[in-house]
């Protein structure tokens, strides 16, 4: 049995602990740590319910701790096989450094590019595996895109698209908070890594808007930061790019969302990271935009995740196109409703932990998501979250449905 520490018991952190215990089939003992007792209390309710839903025994500890305190974090890390960091991106580098120092394998779901580069620097002196960006996007999307790209000799255009959306949109933004509002605003403000004309570069977020439809539903997609992960450099190393290749990641939303967010973040200047106070003492910056979203945009469990990869390139001398699409709705599992964004993000990082335990990922060093083949990912029970979420409960012998 492997001892795994999950730092952060927010909405998705709780789900990571629960899913690892549910689908790990007794392979893991989980310690879930957070400084908010309310989060731990909710986690206990979920895990006590899980005990009644699965046939195998589950072992866990819930620890109230200040995860911003380096000494407390090091104490929690002692004797652990792995740590999954579910904290805001500003905590990531410190946790990764401590984990590497103590010989604890490191995983996170961060989308922040600068933070990931700091993890890569730590990995230059790696004692363990350091595996950042393990969620949905970045994360699974790179695995899926690599699976499409490997079918081509050279790539003309590869577009990765992911959206976590409300099933029922009723406000002008056509958006509900289903993920970290701070993470969303960060993605909408930071530069976006792309390849244009065969050259790796950056473009501003909220640009490159395109419109498309699936199954009668209209969507838009636009550049956002972080989702492409390390895929561009991997495809360059694989010699699949040409002097005209275009590769990019875009976030999917309902039409009209991008324009309104540009109004808030750019025209109203709420995208500033460190704004100076006005004469009245008010500060108009990203923190205010995050607060506005959390105040006004209701949360929902009735969400849907859309994954769409399209690739045009050359195969055996012919120009072809291959598409990949998955649509995941919120699902009843283990006695409760799992929002799609929680399930897919948790499944992404849990799968990578499981594959490392099984020796199917590098034992040490910086590990890219696309180093995991899609077929290998889907061989874990966590792959069902993307392929057939309704079958997850049956796969682990669950008896429970949401009450």
Task: Please report, for each region that a protein language model flagged, where it lies by residue.
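Rossmann-fold NAD(P)-binding glycine/threonine-rich loop
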Residues: 109-132
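Helix N-cap at the beta1-alpha1 junction of Rossmann-like dinucleotide-binding domains, i.e.
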Residues: 35-39, 113
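Conserved Rossmann-fold cofactor-binding substructure of NAD(P)-dependent oxidoreductases
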Residues: 65-79
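C-terminal catalytic/substrate-binding lobe primarily of soluble NAD(P)-dependent oxidoreductases
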Residues: 151-403
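Hydrophobic/small residue at the entry helix of a nucleotide-binding pocket
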Residues: 12
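Rossmann-fold cofactor-recognition segment
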Residues: 51-68
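Beta-loop-alpha module in the N-terminal Rossmann-like domain of NAD(P)-dependent dehydrogenases
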Residues: 71, 83-99, 113-114
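Conserved N-terminal Rossmann-fold NAD(P)-binding element of oxidoreductases
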Residues: 4-8
């Amino acid at each position: 049995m492997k001892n795994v520490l999950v730092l952060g018991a927010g909405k998705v952190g709780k789900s990571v602990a629960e899913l690892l215990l549910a689908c790990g089939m007794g392979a893991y003992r989980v310690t879930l740590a957070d400084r908010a007792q309310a989060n731990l209390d909710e986690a206990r309710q979920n895990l006590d319910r899980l005990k009644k839903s699965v046939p195998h025994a589950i072992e866990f500890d819930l620890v109230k701790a200040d995860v911003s305190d380096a000494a407390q974090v090091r104490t929690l890390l002692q004797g652990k096989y792995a740590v999954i960091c579910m904290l805001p991106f500003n905590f990531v580098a410190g946790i990764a450094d401590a984990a590497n120092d103590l010989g604890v394998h490191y995983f996170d779901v961060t989308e922040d590019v600068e933070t990931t580069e700091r993890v890569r620097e730590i990995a230059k002196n790696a004692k363990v595996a350091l595996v950042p960006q393990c969620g949905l996007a970045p994360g699974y999307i790179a695995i899926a895109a690599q699976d499409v790209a490997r079918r081509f000799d050279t790539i003309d255009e590869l577009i990765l698209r992911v959206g976590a959306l409300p099933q029922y949109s009723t406000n002008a933004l056509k958006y509900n908070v289903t993920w970290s509002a701070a993470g969303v605003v960060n993605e909408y403000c930071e530069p976006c890594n792309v390849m244009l004309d065969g050259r790796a570069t950056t473009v501003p977020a909220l640009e490159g808007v395109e419109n498309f439809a699936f199954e009668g539903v209209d969507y838009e997609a636009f550049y956002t930061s972080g989702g492409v992960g390390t895929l561009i450099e991997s495809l360059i190393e694989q010699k699949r790019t040409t002097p005209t290749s275009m590769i990019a990641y875009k976030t999917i939303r309902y039409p009209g969302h991008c324009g309104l967010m540009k109004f808030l973040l750019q025209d109203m200047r709420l995208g500033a990271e460190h704004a100076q106070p006005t004469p009245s003492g008010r500060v108009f910056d990203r923190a205010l935009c995050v607060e506005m979203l959390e105040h006004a945009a209701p949360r929902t469990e009735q969400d849907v995740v859309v994954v769409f990869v399209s690739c045009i390139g050359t195969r055996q001398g012919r120009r072809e196109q291959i598409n990949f699409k998955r649509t995941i709705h919120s699902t009843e599992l283990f006695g409760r409703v799992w929002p799609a964004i929680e399930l897919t993000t948790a499944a992404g990082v849990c799968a990578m932990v499981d594959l490392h335990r099984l020796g199917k990922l590098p034992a040490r060093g910086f590990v890219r998501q696309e180093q995991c083949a899609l077929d290998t990912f889907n061989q874990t029970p966590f792959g069902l979250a993307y392929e057939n979420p309704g079958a997850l409960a049956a796969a682990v012998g669950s008896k429970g449905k949401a009450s």
